[in-house]
Regions:
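Aromatic/acidic polysaccharide-binding cleft in carbohydrate-active enzymes
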Residues: 320-372
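N-terminal catalytic cores of secreted or lumenal carbohydrate-active enzymes
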Residues: 36-216, 237, 247
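Extracellular/periplasmic catalytic domains that process cell-envelope and extracellular macromolecules
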Residues: 63-67, 102-104, 153-155, 255-257, ...
Length: 372
């Protein structure tokens, strides 16, 4: 198997994990020529003058965002591959990844609500019509939940973000004018008649996970809401998300006493070049009632420029920003470290934090050598 996480590479170059003993800091180093490939070492901190000609001066009077964490997505594929490992090897890998004393101290992970495009099959937790038929499915029960429990045993305070790739198909219509049923995993829109049921679906999912001992820190209403083409997907423009959050999801979480955060959007900096969707979360914030239920917005970097993060923060500094997906693969020559290491370091590891993101989460923590 190939143990793969972009963030593992990104934090390796002169970056520190949460692991710290006495005055030593654990550092993982990767160089773009692979002379050092994820080499772990201990660096002693002291008050001696550094040999480096560069000096970093900290001004304690200037404050930026506090960090909630760094991590990766724990998808169905990730969990399936982890469960295929020998238990002792899996434990060693998870400790190396999530322990803040024996490893890197990953502190934030993302999981799908129902299937993602890296699941074993397409499904939701309510494929039989009627929200009373909600139930966790085999992927959660056999793979995702057992792995999450192992992670929580290593890192009890880890934060978990949930995102759906699609609503149940019986809630879909082909468009909001004709409202014709749309029985496809790909594309479609959420029928407004099912806003309340879908909000209940979120509540039931959060409660079901918590019943398994898995606390959910936050959710997004829809992964990549402007992407109609994913294997499991749902189009949800900003006006739809505004109405869904304001009239259903936000109130439903509040009335059930759940403190789960809601982050809007969860898609690209350039809003997939759709003119009418530009400034997506900011348009939702302009509605005071909808904004009251939103902690902030989430972004991916598959299109556009990270300067959009500064734009959003400048206009709505009271709303948080988190970064929830980036990936490498054949399509972007992602394994070519000589070409990509510093570019990815600048774009994802530094470009997000330096532009107000409180969390940085990359895509699949682990895949096999067939990229699945």
């Amino acid at each position: 198997m190939v143990l793969f996480s972009l963030l593992m590479v990104l934090i390796c170059l002169n970056a520190c994990s949460g692991a710290k003993t006495s005055d030593n800091v654990t550092v993982y180093v990767t160089t773009n020529d692979r002379a050092k490939d994820f080499v772990r070492s201990e660096i002693a901190l002291g008050d001696k003058q550094a040999a480096s000609p560069s000096v970093i001066t900290i001004d304690p009077s200037v404050r930026y965002q506090t960090m909630d964490g760094f991590g990766a997505a724990v998808t169905g594929s990730t969990c399936y591959n982890l469960m295929r490992m020998a238990p002792e090897d899996r434990t060693a890998f998870l400790k190396e990844t999530f322990s803040d004393t024996e490893g890197m101290g990953y502190s934030y992970i993302r999981i799908s609500i129902g299937c993602s495009d890296f699941s074993l099959s397409e499904y939701t937790c309510c494929d039989t019509k009627g929200v009373e038929n909600f139930a966790l499915q085999s992927e959660e029960k056999e793979y995702v939940i057992p792995i999450l429990k192992e992670i929580l045993a290593i890192s009890p305070s880890i934060k978990i973000l949930g995102s759906p790739w699609t609503c149940p198909r019986w809630m879909k219509v082909d468009n909001l004018k004709d409202l014709r049923p749309f029985e496809s995993w790909t594309s479609g829109q959420l029928n407004p008649a099912y806003y309340q049921d879908y909000a209940t679906y979120f509540v039931k999912w959060i409660q079901a996970m918590e019943a398994e001992g898995i606390p959910i820190e936050a959710i997004t209403p829809q992964n990549e809401p402007l992407n109609r083409g994913n294997s499991a997907s749902l189009f949800m423009g900003w006006e739809e998300q505004l109405s869904f959050v304001r009239d259903a999801l936000g109130p439903k979480l509040k009335e059930t006493g759940l403190k789960t955060k809601i982050y809007a959007f969860d898609h690209n900096y350039n809003y997939d070049n759709m003119l009418e969707q530009q400034g997506y979360p900011m348009k939702i914030y302009e509605d005071e009632n909808a904004a009251s239920f939103l902690t902030g917005a989430a972004y991916h970097n598959y299109g556009g420029d990270r300067e959009e993060l500064n734009n959003v923060n400048g206009k709505f500094p009271d709303k948080e920003l988190i970064f929830t997906e980036t990936s490498i693969g054949m399509w972007n020559d992602g394994r070519n470290l000589e070409k990509r290491l510093m570019e990815d370091m600048e774009e994802t590891a530094l470009g997000t934090v330096n532009n107000w993101c409180k969390a940085v989460i990359v895509w699949n923590l682990m895949l096999d050598n067939e990229r699945g």
